């Protein structure tokens, strides 16, 4: 797991841009926050990057299992500081897990 501590890191900036529709459309990705939502995304195999708040990766058995499952799928894992998580997250009080998820498009049958 790589450690990110700078809010000016290009990876952090790219993730933070996903708060805006323009960048979500451009990158075909969006942010998911919180243990349950991230867990569902990992189980679906659509997570590109997983950001874990520093000092919380073993906070619970469930969280450790989510991180292990993401690692097994080859997801890019980052341990981030609180200022970095605040920059990435869209909520006022960020969760311990935030993920960049690939946007799936479904074709409608005519």
Residue ranges and their predicted role:
Residues 1-90:
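N-terminal positively charged helical leader segments and presequences
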Residues 84-110:
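Hydrophobic alpha-helical segments and helix pairs
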């Amino acid at each position: 797991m790589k450690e990110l501590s700078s809010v000016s890191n290009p990876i952090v900036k790219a993730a933070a841009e996903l708060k805006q529709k323009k960048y979500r459309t451009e990158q075909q990705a969006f942010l998911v926050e919180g243990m349950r939502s991230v867990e569902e995304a990992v189980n679906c195999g659509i997570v590109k990057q997983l950001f874990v708040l520093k000092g919380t990766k073993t906070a619970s058995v469930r969280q450790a299992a989510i991180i292990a499952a993401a690692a097994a799928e080859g997801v890019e894992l980052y341990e981030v500081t609180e200022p970095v998580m605040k920059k990435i997250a869209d909520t006022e009080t960020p969760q311990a897990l935030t993920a960049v998820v690939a946007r799936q498009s479904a074709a409608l049958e005519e």
